[in-house]
């Protein structure tokens, strides 16, 4: 590297020329390719390394994100199949720094490395890291197992993409001043789930050393039977004849496949995407078994982990159903597809689920908090585990009934109060408090990036012993404090609920 306005780094494939951002003063390299195009012959196959190039590659513009729908009336499709690229941000120094790799969220179907909230400039300066955000295949092209149509494919292209990116980072990040032996992977929502999938994937072992999963849905996986059903639905929706082949899908315009996949999601009738059309499939290469089973058996990567959820993950569901009866039926239906024998006991633990507040609490816990507690409980047996709850919400967000909703923690962790539209409400009337919370979270996240522990005032999610209550949880509200085994009564209710299997006898939406 050289300390000029256009820093050049030399990777194994060739030189890349970045720039110093005039607004934030950090060095950036955007759209750096780590894999070859996945179009046509590469579709549904494992990714291949990028071919070398001559001269300096211009890395001053963001690369293409993965192909994805916009869920608008026009059926617009964004992105490209040539999407295997990443963005790198670091302070304008020549220090060797720990590396943080961000895997974006977006329900496994949307998102990009350069989503404004994830660009990482403020986080990089606050925590002194080399920050890498990654693009990988999504939706029908990244999270649909099409092996029922032939063997010339892989089950989880997106996970293979992520492993290739981590391999590239291990081999090349030193050229950007990053320490390849201090790599933290982090993600939120589907990105948090991706972190856990990589912890379970044998091919990712040794490519990272710490993990942060924010609001992950750990139970969001398909069995091969479920994936086969979704493939059948897709091929019917795009008008392929009976007994289609992989070549038939590869011959179709990618835009048509993405639109069909978007239509499948909209019409699947699955509340809150408990089990959407697109998510990883249990296979023999990346996910040998359900991630919850992998964690319970202690087979995951034994690395220090921060994991947690927000207090009001599913507050937006309050507006989805207008009557108490509708909410009760929706709650029962959502849980019955997993474990009908124990669904009633869980629902009873949440009081009157016909009321909006209790209904939203149940839904958020079902998708995020309850399975996260299971994972944290298991992981503490193999590595230091740190649990948190993000509870900060401005007066405006509380007045709207949204509270600390899903993804609200991102703005605090990344430190950019202008990154999202919702962040405007965090600033409204409470700017100083928000900045305090953001500084606290960045301090603890940064300490973890550098040391593998978030600080002495945040205990491990440990066991009850010597009079200590155990299950220490850092709560970020207007400040930070520690609670032990919060929501214990709800945790007890979920202990007998099996969230690993889904819809074994469901056929009503394959018609």
Predicted regions and their residues:
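Non-catalytic accessory segments of hydrolases
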Residues: 1-156, 423-441, 449-457, 480, ...
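Short Gly/aromatic-enriched secondary-structure transition segments
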Residues: 24, 28-51, 319-338, 460-470
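Serine-hydrolase-like catalytic core of hydrolytic proteins
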Residues: 71-246, 263, 268, 294-320, ...
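Short, solvent-exposed turn/loop segments enriched in Gly/Ser/Thr/Pro and often Arg
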Residues: 137-139, 186-190, 389-394, 460-468
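Substrate-gating cap/lid region and adjacent catalytic-acid/histidine neighborhood
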Residues: 210, 256-432, 444, 451
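C-terminal domain-tail junction helix/linker
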Residues: 463-491
């Amino acid at each position: 590297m050289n300390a000029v306005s256009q820093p050049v780094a030399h990777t194994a494939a060739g030189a890349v020329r970045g720039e110093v951002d005039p607004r934030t003063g950090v060095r950036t390299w955007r759209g750096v390719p780590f894999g070859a195009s996945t179009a046509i012959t590469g579709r549904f196959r494992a990714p291949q390394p990028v071919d070398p190039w001559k001269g300096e590659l211009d890395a001053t513009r963001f690369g293409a994100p993965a192909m994805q729908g916009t869920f608008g009336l026009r059926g617009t499709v964004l992105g490209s199949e040539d999407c295997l690229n990443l963005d790198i941000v670091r302070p304008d120094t020549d220090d060797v720094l720990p590396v943080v790799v961000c895997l974006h969220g977006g329900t496994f179907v949307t998102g990009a490395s350069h989503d404004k909230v994830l660009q990482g400039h403020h986080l990089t300066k606050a925590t002194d890291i080399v920050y890498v955000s990654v693009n990988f295949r999504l939706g029908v092209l990244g999270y649909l197992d099409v092996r029922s149509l032939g063997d010339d494919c892989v089950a989880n292209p997106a996970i293979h993409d992520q492993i290739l990116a981590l391999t590239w980072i291990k081999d090349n990040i030193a050229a950007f001043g990053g320490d390849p032996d201090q790599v933290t992977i982090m993600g939120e929502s589907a990105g948090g789930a991706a972190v856990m999938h990589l912890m379970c994937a044998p091919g990712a072992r040794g490519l990272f050393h710490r993990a942060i999963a924010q609001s992950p849905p750990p139970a969001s996986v398909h069995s091969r039977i479920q994936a086969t059903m979704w493939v059948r639905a897709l091929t019917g929706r795009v008008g392929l004849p009976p007994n289609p082949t992989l070549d038939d899908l590869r011959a179709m315009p990618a835009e048509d496949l993405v639109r069909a996949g978007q239509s499948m999601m909209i019409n699947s009738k699955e509340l809150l995407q408990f089990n959407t059309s697109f998510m990883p499939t249990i296979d023999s290469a990346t996910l040998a078994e359900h991630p919850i089973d992998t964690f319970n058996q202690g087979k995951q990567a034994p690395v220090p982990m921060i994991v947690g959820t927000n207090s009001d993950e599913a507050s937006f569901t309050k507006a989805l159903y207008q009557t108490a009866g509708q909410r009760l039926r929706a709650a029962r239906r959502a849980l019955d597809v997993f474990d009908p024998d124990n669904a009633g006991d869980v629902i009873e633990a949440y009081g009157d689920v016909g009321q909006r507040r209790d209904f939203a609490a149940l839904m958020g816990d079902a998708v995020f908090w309850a399975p996260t507690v299971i994972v944290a409980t298991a992981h503490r047996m193999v590595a230091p585990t740190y649990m948190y709850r993000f509870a900060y919400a401005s007066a405006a967000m509380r007045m709207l009934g949204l509270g600390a909703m899903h993804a609200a923690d991102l703005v605090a962790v990344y430190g950019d109060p202008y990154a999202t539209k919702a962040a405007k409400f965090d600033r409204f009337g409470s700017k100083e408090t928000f900045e305090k919370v953001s500084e606290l979270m960045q301090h603890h996240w940064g300490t973890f990036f550098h040391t593998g522990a978030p600080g002495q005032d945040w205990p491990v999610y440990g066991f009850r012993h010597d009079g200590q209550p155990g299950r220490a949880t850092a709560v970020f509200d207007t400040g930070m404090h520690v609670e032990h085994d919060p929501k214990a009564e709800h945790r007890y209710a979920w202990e007998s609920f099996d969230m690993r299997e889904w819809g074994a006898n469901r056929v009503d939406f394959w018609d």
